[in-house]
């Protein structure tokens, strides 16, 4: 290996694209990270810190460049492939062909194990369709990727930080960050041998056939240093050979070895190099035969041999690239290079003679001449440096706008002049912070959250993290893998925002802490009533939230009932953010709202309270608890025509709308109230002039309606509809939102004052305290959304505390933050004041209260199909009434109403804007007692009259028509009937047995206490891999289940028998042994049940 010569005329920088003017202020390091020779074409591939992959031909002219990894992720590793090149970043794997077209792109959104990746290799030298990926995250292990399918084939547990991984035909060598090496068998996925190679770390490694070589570093007194030798291992005998020294007795002295590579053609020759620039070619059969060289210029960052062994590429520390080659060697990098494709130049033929005075001939048809020379615009920055072009002058119209003092003249000249609103948009000179897309993708895929997410105090007027619009919790394992405890350290549960209308969560959190409303709704659950779905579903939700501590609840059933009520009234909910991608998608959908009135949150507040009052009357005749709780009673007098005088009546308003009509005008100036009290007083008295027909004589004329207050409720709900001027005054006025005020009625006129001494009357005086309010938050990153401030009374400390509810984020906030309305990103829209004594009442629970459970012992039929149903269950009797600790097994099936919707930007980043919407389709419950063990007593199919995108028949066993009352022969019941049965069983203290109960309870929308759950998927869990019910039944019970479509009765019974098996193994002390055997044998079949021949 003598006579290597350095090519001085071809050294050139390969980082020119990283030094563009528009990249100089982003704060990212700009250098190349890796280079390789292509094994199938005359190309050199490089990767950089921006995630770009570039290729250069034999003349080192740019051929292809592509942004392979987004989010500023540097390229960690490159590998030549028959179809192109593979590149690896810390969280993604990319495959592209040689023309720059993406063939495969996998990120940590697709594969959660992609985190802190460092290296990759093929499964074996002969099998290049599968790739191992590994890194420094010990929790992710080794990921085996199938490139043909583009999926994760398997994830192998490996609890060490990996720095390098190389493979040969039989084995793979794993270089650990600790300095040791593991030999890995791809056939059995086991480590068969380990070596301690270097005391600190491994810096380079290569493997070929049965030879493995490594370089590394050792620990010194104060730092590490490169070892001056190369370790050699014989993989046939599984032992270490004598090491080979590097640069022994040279004029350069003894330097450490940083790079090593076996010669691709000569198996006994190894190339060893140092970062200082020295490199040797050594014959391992006779280490004394060596040739020493020194690379001129800066130090070496990366050094590689081409696949034919004729070229040696050197990437220096300043990103200059040069090559070494032997005399009379081939110019090709590989023995049989593929032909590179270039754009073809069409021959347009000779141009016709055109007169220079012919103005009718378009110049664009002449075209550009074809050239082979290099243009000045593409010269290297090393040769030709330019400070850039001079910026254009500012348009005269813009300078006039800047210097003009009168906007009226601009409007008269046809120029629209809009002053910038600092209160609405914030400071215009504020620089937008850099947002790491890599961090965002990692947080979404792993369920992690930033450390500062609970910060509520604003810094420099900016939006604090706790107020920001939270992303959808959609990870690989849905919401189960998300760390909700990190965003909620309070005893009050949050709400999942993975629903159709997430901003309705704010209303739920506002009213659930009003004792009178919450206690009444929950008390209605004692009775059986299925005709008021909105009221009962809201009651079930309040009960579930009250029993769930520091967790999360879903509002699925409540949202479905609310949508049904809105649909009946031809209404829909307004999307508050114009930039919301989901709104844009829905506007293009065939199922658009079609002219429905869209309700704002103020209108929804009034509509919801009114609907609850109406359903309360239907639920319990002559019951007006809610009406007396929050409805204001008004007397309405209508002054008719001159003939018939006036008429009178009563009006109950659940919410008082206050807005800019409370302002007064004097001397042409508009005056607004200096606190919310003036708006409240104006809202409680009103006089309206309507132009309509008189009901007595039918004459159309102006009729005056005088509305006067008669009685104030304990709870005062206020809907704020302010214009910009009124809101601006509220933000700049101190104590605009008072902590408390006093109100009274004198001569049918309201008196609202800040102090009790300001009211002089003999009538009753009410003291109101601020309970909470809903605020609209302007988030520049993710659009507007709503949060709730609630003041909650603690019975132990006898004190009130303020809490912020932002969907699933719940945190305690300081009182000063609540009353500070001066922030430009906050706008209150619904405010609740409550009677001082009312807010201190205790919350009641349903414990030790007699509940109507008759639905458990009778059939409930829908659509008169009693005679034609197929009954597969046997009803409970009073003799076998459930008691605390009664064993029951449950399984539920679901169908898909709507599939997922994504927002894919121009870079290919995919964001979930609407998760998959599922609906409960069937619930089966079987007995677990010894008398009638395994006999079902509930088998309810749920009526679904909405469009169903996918019945999931293979997994649910539901066929088209099974859920339709017109065609089904199943036992169909409404959703609230089936839900009440499960809720009653939970209230009676039954113990639920099932497989994957967390998913079942999530779709049923019920929160069962942990002490009442026996989940066989958790009992037979080792690590993170859950075993399927079918596999466990096959191995442990020796039965085949789910051979065709799933059947919920069969699945529930199998889970029950499996739980009995678990108790038997636990009592015998065989559980750990059987569990280890389950996973060891399951790896050979990928935990699948063998197919029948």
From Swiss-Prot:
Ranges of residues in domain USP: 462-836
One family name in Pfam for this protein: UCH_1
First-listed, main subcellular location of the protein, grouped into a coarse class: cytoplasm
Cofactor(s) essential for the protein: a divalent metal cation
Subunit structure: Forms a heterotrimer with an asymmetric homodimer of the regulatory subunit PAN3 to form the poly(A)-nuclease (PAN) deadenylation complex.
Role description: Catalytic subunit of the poly(A)-nuclease (PAN) deadenylation complex, one of two cytoplasmic mRNA deadenylases involved in mRNA turnover. PAN specifically shortens poly(A) tails of RNA and the activity is stimulated by poly(A)-binding protein PAB1. PAN deadenylation is followed by rapid degradation of the shortened mRNA tails by the CCR4-NOT complex. Deadenylated mRNAs are then degraded by two alternative mechanisms, namely exosome-mediated 3'-5' exonucleolytic degradation, or deadenylation-dependent mRNA decaping and subsequent 5'-3' exonucleolytic degradation by XRN1.
Protein name per UniProt: PAN2-PAN3 deadenylation complex catalytic subunit PAN2
This protein's encoding gene: PAN2
């Amino acid at each position: 290996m003598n006579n290597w010569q350095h090519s001085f005329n071809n050294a050139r920088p390969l980082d020119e694209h990283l030094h563009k003017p528009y990249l100089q202020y982003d704060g990212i390091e700009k250098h190349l990270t890796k280079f390789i020779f292509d094994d199938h074409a005359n190309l050199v591939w490089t990767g950089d810190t921006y995630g770009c992959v570039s290729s250069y031909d034999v003349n080192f002219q740019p051929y292809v460049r592509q942004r392979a990894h987004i989010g500023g992720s540097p390229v960690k590793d490159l590998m030549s492939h028959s179809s192109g090149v593979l590149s690896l970043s810390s969280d993604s794997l990319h495959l592209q062909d040689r023309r720059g077209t993406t063939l495969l792109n996998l990120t940590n959104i697709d594969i959660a194990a992609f985190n802190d990746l460092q290296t990759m290799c093929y499964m074996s030298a002969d099998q290049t369709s599968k790739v191992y990926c590994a890194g420094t995250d010990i929790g992710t292990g080794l990921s085996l990727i199938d490139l043909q399918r583009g999926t994760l084939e398997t994830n192998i547990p490996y609890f060490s930080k990996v720095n390098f991984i190389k493979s040969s035909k039989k084995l793979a060598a794993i270089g650990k960050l600790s300095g040791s090496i593991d030999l890995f068998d791809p056939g059995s996925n086991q480590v068969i041998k380990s070596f301690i190679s270097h005391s600190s770390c491994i810096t380079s490694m290569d493997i070929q056939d049965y030879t493995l070589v490594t370089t590394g570093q050792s620990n010194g007194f104060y730092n590490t240093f490169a070892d001056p030798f190369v370790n050699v291992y014989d993989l046939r005998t599984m032992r270490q050979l004598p090491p080979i020294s590097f640069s022994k007795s040279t004029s350069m002295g003894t330097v450490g070895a940083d790079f090593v590579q076996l010669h691709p053609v000569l198996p006994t020759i190894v190339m060893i190099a140092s970062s200082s620039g020295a490199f040797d070619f050594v014959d391992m059969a006779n280490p004394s035969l060596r040739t020493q060289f020194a690379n001129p210029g800066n130090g070496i960052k990366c050094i590689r041999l081409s696949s034919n062994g004729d070229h040696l590429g050197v990437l220096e520390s300043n990103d200059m690239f040069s090559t070494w080659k032997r005399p009379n060697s081939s110019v090709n990098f590989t023995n049989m290079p593929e032909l590179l494709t270039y754009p073809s130049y069409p021959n347009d033929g000779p141009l016709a003679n055109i007169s220079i005075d012919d103005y009718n001939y378009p110049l664009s048809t002449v075209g550009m001449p074809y050239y082979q020379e290099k243009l000045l615009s593409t010269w290297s920055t090393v040769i030709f440096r330019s400070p850039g072009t001079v910026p254009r002058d500012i348009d005269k119209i813009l300078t006039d706008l800047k210097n003009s003092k009168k906007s009226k003249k601009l409007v008269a000249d046809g120029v629209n002049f809009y002053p910038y609103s600092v209160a609405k948009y914030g400071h215009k000179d504020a620089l937008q912070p850099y947002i790491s897309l890599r961090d965002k993708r990692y947080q979404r895929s792993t369920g992690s959250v930033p450390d500062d997410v609970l910060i509520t105090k604003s810094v420099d007027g900016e939006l604090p993290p706790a107020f920001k619009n939270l992303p959808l919790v959609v990870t690989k394992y849905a919401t189960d893998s998300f760390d909700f405890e990190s965003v909620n350290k309070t005893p009050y549960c949050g709400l999942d925002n993975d629903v159709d209308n997430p901003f309705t969560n704010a209303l739920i959190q506002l009213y659930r802490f009003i004792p009178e409303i919450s206690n009444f709704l929950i008390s209605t659950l004692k009775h059986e009533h299925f005709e008021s779905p909105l009221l009962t579903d809201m009651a079930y939700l309040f009960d579930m939230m009250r029993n769930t501590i520091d967790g999360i609840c879903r509002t699925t059933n409540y949202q479905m009932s609310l949508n049904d009520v809105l649909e009946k009234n031809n209404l829909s909910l307004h999307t508050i953010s114009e930039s919301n991608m989901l709104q844009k998608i829905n506007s293009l959908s065939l199922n658009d709202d079609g002219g429905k009135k869209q309700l704002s949150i103020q209108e929804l507040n009034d509509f919801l309270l009114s609907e609850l009052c109406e359903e309360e009357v239907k639920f319990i005749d002559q019951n007006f608890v809610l009406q007396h709780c929050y409805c204001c009673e008004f007397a309405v007098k209508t002054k008719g025509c001159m003939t018939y005088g006036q008429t009178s009546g009563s009006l109950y308003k659940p919410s008082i709308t206050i807005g800019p009509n409370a302002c007064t005008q004097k001397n042409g100036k508009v005056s607004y109230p200096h606190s919310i009290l003036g708006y409240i007083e104006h809202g409680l008295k009103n006089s309206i002039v309507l132009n309509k027909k008189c009901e007595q004589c039918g004459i159309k004329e102006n009729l005056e309606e005088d509305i006067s207050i008669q009685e104030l409720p304990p709870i005062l709900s206020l809907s704020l509809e302010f214009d910009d001027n009124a809101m601006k005054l509220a933000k700049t006025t101190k104590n605009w939102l008072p902590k408390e005020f006093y109100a009274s009625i004198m001569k049918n006129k309201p008196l609202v004052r800040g102090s009790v001494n300001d009211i002089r009357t003999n009538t009753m005086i009410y003291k109101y305290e601020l309970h909470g309010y809903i605020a609209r938050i302007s988030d520049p990153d993710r659009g507007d959304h709503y949060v709730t401030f609630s003041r909650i009374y603690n019975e132990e400390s006898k004190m009130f505390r303020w809490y912020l509810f932002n969907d699933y984020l719940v945190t305690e906030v300081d009182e000063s933050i609540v009353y500070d309305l001066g922030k430009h990103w906050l706008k209150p829209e619904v405010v609740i004041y409550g009677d001082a004594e009312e807010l201190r009442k205790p919350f009641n629970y349903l414990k030790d209260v007699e509940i109507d459970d008759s639905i458990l012992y009778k059939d409930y039929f829908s659509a008169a199909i009693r005679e034609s149903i197929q009954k597969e269950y046997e009803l409970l009797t009073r003799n076998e009434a459930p008691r605390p600790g009664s064993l029951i097994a449950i399984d539920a099936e679901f169908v898909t109403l709507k599939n997922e919707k994504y927002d894919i930007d121009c870079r290919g980043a995919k964001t979930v804007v609407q998760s998959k919407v599922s609906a409960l389709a069937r619930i089966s419950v079987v007995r677990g007692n010894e008398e009638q063990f395994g006999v079902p007593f509930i088998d309810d199919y749920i009526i679904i009259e909405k469009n169903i995108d996918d019945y999931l028949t293979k997994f649910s066993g539901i066929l088209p028509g099974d859920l339709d009352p017109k065609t089904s022969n199943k036992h169909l019941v409404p959703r609230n009937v089936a839900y009440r049965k499960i809720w009653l069983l939970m209230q009676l203290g039954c113990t639920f047995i099932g497989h994957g109960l967390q998913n079942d309870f999530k779709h049923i929308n019920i929160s069962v206490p942990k002490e009442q759950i026996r989940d066989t998927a958790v009992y037979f869990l080792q690590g993170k891999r859950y075993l399927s019910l079918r596999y466990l039944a096959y191995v442990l019970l020796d039965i085949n289940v789910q051979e065709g479509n799933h059947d919920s009765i069969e699945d529930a019974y199998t889970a029950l028998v499996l739980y009995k098996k678990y108790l038997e193994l636990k009592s015998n002390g065989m559980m750990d042994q059987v569990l280890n055997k389950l996973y060891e044998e399951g790896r050979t079949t990928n935990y699948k049940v063998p197919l029948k021949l």
